[in-house]
UniProtKB/Swiss-Prot annotation:
The lineage of its organism: Bacteria, Pseudomonadati, Acidobacteriota, Terriglobia, Terriglobales. The gene is infB. Residues 279-291 have a biased composition (Pro residues). Residues 614-617 are annotated as: G3. The keyword Nucleotide-binding applies. One of the essential components for the initiation of protein synthesis. Protects formylmethionyl-tRNA from spontaneous hydrolysis and promotes its binding to the 30S ribosomal subunits. Also involved in the hydrolysis of GTP during the formation of the 70S ribosomal complex. It comes from Acidobacterium capsulatum (strain ATCC 51196 / DSM 11244 / BCRC 80197 / JCM 7670 / NBRC 15755 / NCIMB 13165 / 161). This is Translation initiation factor IF-2. Residues 67-77 have a biased composition (Basic and acidic residues). Residues 704-706 are annotated as: G5. Residues 552-728 form the tr-type G domain. Pfam families: EF-G_D2 (PF22042), GTP_EFTU (PF00009), GTP_EFTU_D2 (PF03144), IF-2 (PF11987), IF2_N (PF04760). Residues 668-671 are annotated as: G4. One of its GO terms (molecular function) is GTP binding.
């Protein structure tokens, strides 16, 4: 026996597989089954019967409001919405006429009426005869929900009365009486039929129900007018009379065995030929239609199922009719029969049994002219014209499985104007374009993902509505968090731009700006150093306590100026003033900052302190400003009165203005006879620094460092400008400062000079500075004395660093060492990301630059210095010396003596070690001699630059220049055995030399290039032949012709140049 899978049976019964598994025990199946198990044929029959009983029981009892079906509309008879309104108006007019007529005399019916069979064959319904009019009310004892549908047959005559149907409508309170039906119309080939005559209505007698079998879920009724579409009418549950004439070729499916007469009359009526009379339009009565109750069109109902009349020879047992969808019942069994509601040709009906012999037309799409198979013919029960009504119900159905022949299924998009109800993207019958089958088991509800993973990718740039701040080398994940989008959306956007990245990959600044603009955000890219400075200041602000006392602090002054303008002399003079005031003199300054105390009693600034920074010029000041650390409070610009304003002076002024720092101009060397202080004031006034005595706001002080003139006035003016700035600090908070200089001491390790800007720094404090951390083991002031704490504006030298910090890094005291270590590790990771971002992505421009640099010479260097400031300045200045032909590459730079590791690195990379104010130890020098590593030691930067320039020139290839000598014309060609071809020439200009190179030209093209093998004047060898003389020239070629030109030249080596010409 054939088996049926539980999944297939569940789809057939339109239930879940779990429901079938739960019902197996009730059906006598004790073996354990799963969703993919199979059932025997007899077991499947029992399961179908079980669900059929359950659906009928649910339809009659229980939740009546939920399971009771709604009345249906025969969509096959509605072509447009106007037909519905027309049918309603005609129906109302007919009802009005019927209500005005007198009651007709009841007559006996002409033919027995077959009632629809019950679900079980053992309990058939008896045949019911229809009583003649007038209209009779329904007995109160009969419930509408259990009243069966009854159809009336009167014969096959052309003028037979229309059948009567009892329409159950349980939820309508008012009673409606239908007008008398029209006679059976004659049917033409295609157009719909029209009524010919009208007969009095027929009243159906109440039916005595002997047994109450399990009826279908609901009885749905549709009335089909001969002149229009079928319209549902609100009726009363007690008195309802509906009239609907069947078509001329009406037929009836065979009734139950209890009514054999009715089953035999159906095929006879089906064979009645259609009359050839043209369709007649019905007359519309002049009686106005009274207002009727609003008609509600239901949107649910079964799919229309078409059938053909069964052959008369072998009647088929009819199946129970049912217009509504019965859940749990197989979808293939919904083929109502009989000329009753739900039967073929009737209102709301579908297909009957398909005929076994040749007959009616096979089902076809409404837009097709001919079906795919079967001979053309009239389809019983349907018009051959265009299908009236509303067309397909919203969300329509696909082709019925197993129905039709090849060519019956319309192609996709062939049916115009088929609306879809929400959520009905799937068609029945397996005809669907997108995932027609519902999956069971673990793959239930699965649908393939959309393109780009469902990413919402903006196709056009959004308007700029916000601003974000990112660091260099930000990862894709961090950028997505700042933009508020998903990481895969950002990756998809980059993919559309041709950039392939992962979620952890770093991005460069320009790409970040472009992508953020696509998502409606303006981007500010800051460096890693700026981020660390911002974090430090945020921590500073977060730790501020309004209850803490703010005190005035000493100003921090930076002295800047052009070379040889007396900057160093002025600082020495100020220091001498401090020493003359009683301080110990001759103190060697180990750090670049020191304090000066004003001890002149008659001075207004007596007892005040000023901190001077001895920084390496404007270069270090620019770096501090770029890192966001405003170390300097006041800038003193030193200008020589005899020399005037120089370019470096203007550059220092620009840096001070960019840092928004007050400027004091010290006009030095006023003791010289050629001094012109007014010229200096005019030059600086043109740059925006207008003196106070000229109506400006810039303080000008005329000083002489050599004679120590007006130095006290300069210090007093510095204190006055500081008071205007209201410089305050909070000594009670944790210390915050800036690294001025850092160096590596052999005995003490890493040493940093720090200027405390706020708070108080104490010994044993844990701190974070840049990307390193540490704990203060010892602290010294500017005079080398060990101290325990340092207040605001105090320069100190600290020990206890784990690594070397950079000049300008922010110094911040934290709670404990572990926290400082975590912050340092995080900053080191971010710094690595920045470096990777600069080197990982290779664009087309970068690739072209690499190809261009492939032919460049490279000079690798290892740079070691005494302090970090010197190393930074040297590294920048040396790299700026790179040209298009030679590029300087600093492999490693550091602070301290030259070590063995430096020598090994230089040996591996063929680099030169440059030592600035440092020397190698004995082991390092021996290793360098063994490895043939060159070490160059310097103390002056200018000498270092000159030596590097010579090394760069030595790397260039030798350059040769062609020098023209003379030209001769070939007059004759001689071929001498054992010697070769000799050209007899006359020198046209210049000279031909025996050691020169020649070029043989013919017609402006070079034929041969080489050296002269011989040069003779007649029979004698000659060293050279001058202009106008004839000679014999021997060449290492035989391709010589009369009229060729011999050009003589030499190649000279010239000095190479670093820049391209």
């Amino acid at each position: 026996m054939s088996k049926v899978r539980i999944n297939d049976l569940a789809r057939e019964l339109e239930v879940k597989s779990k429901a079938i598994l739960d019902a197996l025990a009730d059906c006598g199946v004790t073996e354990k089954k799963t969703h993919s198990s199979s059932l025997e044929a007899d077991e499947a029959v029992r399961v179908r019967a079980h669900f059929a009983r359950g659906s009928r029981g649910a339809g009659q009892g229980g939740s009546r409001q939920q399971n009771e079906p709604k009345p249906k509309i025969d969509w096959s008879r509605v072509s447009k919405p106007g037909d519905v309104l027309k049918a309603i108006q005609e129906r109302n007019e007919q009802e009005t006429v019927a209500a005005a007529r007198p009651a007709a005399v009841p007559v006996a019916p002409k033919a027995p009426v077959s009632a629809p069979p019950a679900a079980r064959p053992s309990a058939p319904r008896p045949a019911v005869t229809a009583a003649p009019p007038p209209v009779a009310a329904r007995p109160a004892g009969v419930q509408p929900g259990s009243q069966p549908a009854v159809s009336v047959q009167h014969g096959a005559e052309a003028q037979k009365p229309a059948p009567r149907r009892i329409v159950p409508q349980p939820r309508q309170p008012s009673a409606v009486v239908a007008p008398p039906p029209a006679a059976t119309p004659a049917i033409a080939a295609r157009p719909p039929a029209a009524p010919v005559a009208v007969k009095p209505p027929v009243t159906t007698a109440p039916i005595a129900q002997q047994e109450k079998p399990a009826a279908p879920a609901a009885q749905e009724v549709k009335s089909a007018l001969a002149t229009g579409p079928s319209v549902p009418v609100a009726v009363s549950p007690s008195v309802v009379v509906a009239a609907a004439p069947p078509p001329a070729t009406a037929f009836q499916a065979p009734a139950a065995p209890a009514a054999p007469a009715a089953s035999q009359s159906a095929p006879q009526e089906a064979k009645t030929p259609a009359a050839e009379a043209p369709p007649v339009a019905p007359e519309k009565p002049a009686v106005p239609a009274p207002p009727q109750r609003r008609v509600i069109m239901p949107q649910t109902g079964p799919r229309p199922v078409y059938t053909a009349p069964p052959p008369s020879a072998s009647p088929v047992t009819p199946r129970p009719s049912g217009g509504g969808i019965q859940r749990g019942k197989p979808i293939f069994d919904r083929r109502p029969t009989g000329n009753s509601p739900g039967g073929p040709g009737g209102p709301g009906g579908g297909y009957g049994q398909r005929p076994s012999g040749p007959g009616g037309r096979r089902p076809m799409h409404p837009t097709r002219n001919q079906p795919g198979g079967g001979p053309p013919g009239g389809r019983p029960g349907f018009n051959n014209g265009p299908r009236p009504g509303f067309g397909q119900r919203p969300g329509g159905f696909g082709q019925r499985p197993g129905m039709g022949a090849p060519g019956l299924v319309p192609p996709p998009g062939d049916t115009p104007g088929r609306p879809q109800r929400p959520g009905a993207g799937q068609k029945r019958g397996g005809r669907s374009n997108q995932y027609p089958k519902s999956k069971e088991g673990p793959m239930k509800g699965f649908a393939p993902p959309s393109r780009f993973g469902g990413a919402q990718i903006p196709t056009e740039p959004l308007p700029i509505t916000r601003t974000i701040t990112v660091t260099e080398g930000i990862s894709v994940k961090d950028l997505a968090e700042k933009l508020g989008v998903r990481g895969k959306d950002l990756i998809a956007t980059l993919l559309m731009r041709g950039v392939f990245v992962t979620v952890n990959q770093s991005l460069d600044g320009e790409l970040v700006k472009d992508v953020a603009r696509q998502f409606g955000a303006d981007t500010t890219v800051i460096s890693f150093e700026d981020q660390m400075a911002n974090e430090a200041f945020e921590n500073l602000l977060s730790q501020e306590n309004p209850d803490e006392l703010e005190l005035s602090r000493p100003p921090v002054v930076t002295v800047m100026g052009h070379v040889d303008h007396g900057k160093t002399s002025l600082l020495d003079a100020i220091r001498e003033t401090d020493v003359a005031g009683g301080e110990a003199g001759g103190i060697t300054q180990h750090i670049g900052a020191y304090k000066v105390r004003i001890n002149k009693e008659d001075s207004p600034a007596f007892g005040r302190e000023i901190v001077f920074l001895d920084t390496p010029g404007h270069e270090a000041f620019t770096r501090m400003r770029a890192r966001g650390a405003k170390v300097t409070d006041i800038v003193v610009i030193v200008v020589a009165a005899d020399d005037g304003v120089m370019p470096q002076t203007l550059e220092a002024v620009d840096h001070a203005k960019a840092a928004n720092v007050p400027i004091i101009v010290a006009v030095n060397k006023i003791d010289k006879p050629e001094a012109q202080p007014d010229r200096v004031k005019k030059q600086l006034g043109d740059r925006g620094l207008v003196p106070e005595d000229w109506g400006g706001s810039t303080v000008f002080v005329d000083v002489s460092a050599k004679k120590r003139q007006n130095l006290d006035l300069l210090l007093e003016m510095i204190c006055l400008v500081a008071d205007l700035g209201n410089l305050k600090a909070t000594p009670g908070r944790s210390a915050v400062g800036t690294v001025i200089e850092a160096k590596l001491d052999r005995g003490r390790g890493a040493v940093a000079s720090v200027l405390v800007q706020n708070g108080t720094l104490r010994a044993q404090d844990s701190f974070i500075v840049g990307n390193t951390f540490g704990k203060i083991r010892a602290m010294f002031d500017d005079r080398g004395r060990a101290i325990e704490e340092a207040g605001p504006s105090t320069p100190v030298e600290i020990l206890g660093l784990e690594n070397m910090p950079d000049a300008g890094d922010t110094f911040l005291v934290v709670a404990d060492r572990d926290k400082a270590k975590g912050i340092a590790q995080y900053r080191q990771m971010k710094e690595r990301e920045v470096q990777l971002a600069k080197s990982s992505r290779v664009s087309l421009e970068g690739l072209a630059e690499q190809i261009k640099q492939a032919g460049m010479k490279e000079l690798p260097l290892i740079l070691k210095g005494d302090v970090t400031g010197s190393v930074e300045v040297l590294a920048d200045s040396l790299q700026k010396m790179s040209t298009e032909k030679v590029r300087i590459k600093v492999i490693h730079s550091g602070v301290g003596a030259i070590t063995e590791s430096d020598v090994l690195l230089a040996s591996a990379s063929n680099a030169i070690i440059i030592g600035f104010n440092v020397k190698p130890d004995r082991k390092s020098a021996d290793l360098a001699e063994q490895e043939n590593v060159e070490i160059r030691l310097h103390t002056i930067i200018y000498e270092l630059q000159e030596e590097i320039t010579k090394a760069m020139l030595g790397l260039l290839d030798p350059v040769f220049k062609e020098s023209y000598l003379g030209r001769a014309e070939v007059l004759n060609v001689f071929k001498i055995p054992k010697i070769g071809t000799i050209a007899g020439c006359r020198v046209l200009d210049g000279v031909l030399r025996r050691d020169s190179e020649i070029r043989l030209m013919r017609g402006g093209e070079q034929v041969f290039k080489g050296k002269l093998t011989s040069l003779k004047r007649f029979k004698d060898d000659a060293k050279e032949v001058t202009n106008g003389m004839e000679c014999g020239v021997g060449l290492n070629t035989s391709d010589i012709q009369v009229g060729d030109t011999v050009e003589a030249f030499t190649m000279e080596r010239v000095a190479a140049e670093l820049t391209a010409q």
